[in-house]
């Protein structure tokens, strides 16, 4: 049906007859000469039809060409010629194809939007097949394809085995809500779609496969946002007989190689490492964006003698924090803008945002200065490193809450003051706490997941005694403020796994019911093992330069968890419900 791709026609083909197929990108009738931009997945080439040529066939061709609409599907035969008016904006801009035959393969209906427009997201998702024709969307999908291909090549080359794990599996508490599938042959029972292949890949290590990977589809019934979908894709990996450093060194090399191969991006030869505690102290986040040269500074010791109640209450609380953030040249902020910053941090839990301005003259303006002696306040600002022209923001309260809203403020200030450098800053975050205490549930929860091994603790009694301060063997890879991969060394001894379940409030009977197959497998000579999973959607979005992972997923869901193209989810018939033994209950709004 075609001999060449549109976007690959070049000077080497001048004088040759070619057959092309594609879509009408633009058709222009310029007084007897028709120019058609014919587009396929490789690009655009200009097709020319001149009605003035003394040829009956050309007259018919011109009639066809002048009646074309956007996105009509064509087959064109013609001769490649040098183009008189070179177009340097496209790679075929030095040539054109003088048409000898044009066949309309399919007419397109009037379009809801054109391929070169950028309409609202809802209409793009409704007509996703048209949206995906746009050159920018084609570029982003190709980025994703190249990324997956490069990852597979690297892993295949290093002896990893691509092994599929079940999609219909057992419901287990891994954090988010499961998607459940009724089991028709077992009335009242349900499968769950996997949130990750975590347990299966561990069992593959017990089974002796040594190095596993999978481009895995995962499902989590959770609230959506720009970087989260109900169904997503991850590169899942597991290694037997490895330490944390073994895993990190291998995947570091892989990510460096893949970024260079896919996008020409050069990453650091060695990724820096930072403990979770240091990341929270300096940046208020366990996924810090190192491109922003702003850090939080703890000032509890310097504000303890003030009479400002929010500060003194935080200092007195064992879980309190008082942190400062200096923004260079920040005195340009008006009172209205400062109030907007306060409102912004309130979304992240702040109950107030104190500040101090240092005018270029050296004058200090601050609503909290009156709660300090003049020397004490000057000493505080000096400790923070504040200079003339700077503004300093202060956050006080619960440690985690202060970290959250001051981290959000740091990111916003970085954008607003153009402090984000145009480079790539990867790092490893390590030494996560093994557990977090859930005040509401009055029990421990796993910071990573229940299968992560504790660090430097082999004795069960010691783990029980030091659960609140125990560290895990977990690690995250962070790039420009995005967690792109997370992993850990796993628990491989059944008695340690039981002890962790116990600390998490999972009873022996519940552990047996939900994880009995894992506990049994660990009894039969499970090797030490560990692994990591990378978010394909997120990495593809970073490389492609988009803030939304929806742009690199061919058919994403909206933030309302719908597919606008297919109208999923949709009701099903009573007959279908009866077959799967399900009765639905309507809820009143």
Swiss-Prot record:
InterPro entries registered for this protein in UniProt: Aa-tRNA-synt_II, aa-tRNA-synth_II, aa-tRNA-synth_II/BPL/LPL, Asp-tRNA-ligase_1, Asp-tRNA-ligase_1_N, Asp/Asn-tRNA-synth_IIb, AspRS_core, GAD-like_sf
GO cellular component: cytoplasm
Chain spans, region Aspartate: 198-201
Coiled coil: none
Cystine connections: none
PROSITE patterns: AA_TRNA_LIGASE_II
Organism, scientific name: Xylella fastidiosa (strain M12)
Gene name of the encoded protein: aspS
Subcellular location: Cytoplasm
Enzyme superclass (EC): ligase
Main location, first listed in the record: cytoplasm
Protein name: Aspartate--tRNA ligase
